[in-house]
């Protein structure tokens, strides 16, 4: 682990109020991951350090969210933020017919009240608080007060200006970036969540002050069905959106290679004032909603490369639907951001703390999984094709010299 820079400071942004929200008992998105992550960080002695603080966020005011979001949509979100609607739905058995009858069509046009985006008491307050957490982290990093910030309940990258989408109600990323742009800053957003960041991409598709880089499972097989390599921005923003769609069963080795060939040179050329990184852990092989074969071994390598290159970084949790694997990955990421080696002081103690069946001998690191044979050949061939397109189409816009792709060296 590299030495921690002098005068380094970091914040873990956390609120019990955020962690205790629940979309529904059966919904795959679990805010409780934030509390479990903080608990595991404490177990690994990753919190009680002189340079680390836990800070509690405040809800973001309506008018700040309205700098990005459509006002009528935010008002609709406020409208469904009532126990009345939640109780109306809970008192009648769930059927498609009931859902259509009990949800106002004017609300449905905002994609509120769907299976993905259920309405529940406190949904507006929850969204405003999550956005406030990301906004706080962005301000602290931008001002230089801290060099690293982590908001585990952040990264709602699917929400659009005028509707909810993909478990996301308020696009905290777009709201924060919009504010940072008003302060004259250049921002890079690096997203390694398995799902493409369609909401953030759409928000800044024509803007050359924001560099959006997303490595994700291909939209040919996974929601939101977007994020192909030829989506590179438009107008002044041409070349400032970069997508690396990954084929199913992509392993650690292939993911890290794709990241190394694209992200560091683009960040160096763009020279942002700060970087926001979405560290979604749904790329994990055990995730129930995705089809990649990564472990937190490759995930940790990528986070480490970001931490080494970026002096000011805001990290957001994003997705991850195997709760325990996600919590382990986020804990590992927090350790890396703070230049710490996680060690479990309870290993070997009879009756000591336990954290699910995945904790093996107190080590947060997974054993990597390798694709082999024709599967590996297919993965490499597809990733080579995507990387070639980016290098030939996007790199020249940023005056990045073309070199032989690392993936081809020694392969012929």
Annotate the PLM regions.
Residues 1-408:
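HDAC/HDAC-like amidohydrolase catalytic core signature
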